[in-house]
């Protein structure tokens, strides 16, 4: 009688463990999906931040350049080699963009 009860107990434990393994597998699958969704959302958020950063940077750069153009159009003499030079700002903008892109590469 004890051997039959022991056998039933062993089978019950084995089935319970098998069910727990299946539940763990399902939970891991769901966690993986959630992790992938979270990674995609993080990537989208980073892309949005990069776009906002680029827009802000272009506004800051284009402001002084536009001021120089307006000053020249108004007849003022503007030093072409000053820090407001177009090439200087383009170089700075490209350098910052490249470093920012490299920071968030996949």
Curated annotation (Swiss-Prot):
Q: What else is known?
A: Translated by a ribosomal termination-reinitiation process from the bicistronic mRNA coding for VP1 and VP2.
Subunit (UniProt): Homooligomer. The portal-like structure consists in 12 copies of VP2. Interacts with capsid protein VP1.
Q: What is known of its domains?
A: The N-terminus domain points away from the virion surface.
Cellular component, GO, one term:
viral capsid, decoration
Write down what this protein is called: Minor capsid protein VP2
Instruction: Assign the protein's first listed, main location to one coarse class.
Output: virion
Q: Which domain of life is it from?
A: Viruses
Kindly state which keywords UniProt assigns to this record, in alphabetical order: Capsid decoration protein, Capsid protein, Host cytoplasm, Virion
* Localization annotation: Virion; Host cytoplasm
- Tell me, what does this protein do in biology? Minor structural protein that forms a portal-like structure at a unique three-fold axis of symmetry, following binding to the host receptor. The virion attaches to feline junctional adhesion molecule A (F11R). Once attached, the virion is endocytosed. Acidification of the endosome induces conformational change of capsid protein thereby injecting virus genomic RNA into host cytoplasm. The channel formed by VP2 may allow the delivery of the viral genome through the host endosomal membrane.
Q: Which family does it belong to?
A: Belongs to the vesivirus VP2 protein family.
Q: Which InterPro entries match?
A: Vesivirus_VP2
Offer one Pfam family short name for this entry: Vesi_VP2
């Amino acid at each position: 009688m004890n051997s039959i009860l022991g056998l039933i107990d062993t089978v019950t434990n084995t089935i319970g463990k098998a069910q727990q393994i299946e539940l763990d597998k399902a939970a891991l699958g769901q966690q993986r999906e959630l992790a992938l969704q979270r990674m995609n959302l993080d990537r989208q958020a980073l892309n949005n931040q990069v776009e906002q950063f680029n827009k802000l940077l272009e506004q800051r750069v284009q402001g002084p350049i536009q001021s120089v153009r307006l000053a020249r159009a108004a007849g003022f003499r503007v030093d072409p080699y000053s820090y407001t030079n177009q090439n200087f700002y383009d170089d700075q903008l490209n350098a910052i963009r490249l470093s920012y892109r490299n920071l968030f590469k996949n």
